[in-house]
Amino acid sequence: TDLLSDNEIIENLIFISNGSPGKLIDNLEIWDQIPENIKHDIKYPLKNYENILFLAKHITSQLNLDQQEFLLDYMQRIWWKKTKNKMFAEILEGIKKNISSNLQPRISWEVGLLKVKLKDS
């Protein structure tokens, strides 16, 4: 399997918790609430354009905004470790900014993830 090991997941969750035990507990709870299909599909590289549209739909229909913001932080961490591509981090940060500004979350996810795929092609 190409899923991250439990140790890698914990390491990433600790990193995005910025050393705060309380934040780590919150992040562990959020991680456990995220459906497995979403956890699987956020791995870099993204599969294809159709998968990206389904991923955006699943994220926005199955996760609340706090969970989506957490997921973006997590994706920034795992994608940075894999690619060291600053542009991808900026795109993900842009999605987070858009959804926290109450712009259409699904469109924000679709456009952002499609940008990543286009830059990666």
For the regions a language model picked out, list residue spans one by one.
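Charged, glycine-rich active-site and insertion segments that engage polyanionic ligands
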Residues: 1-121
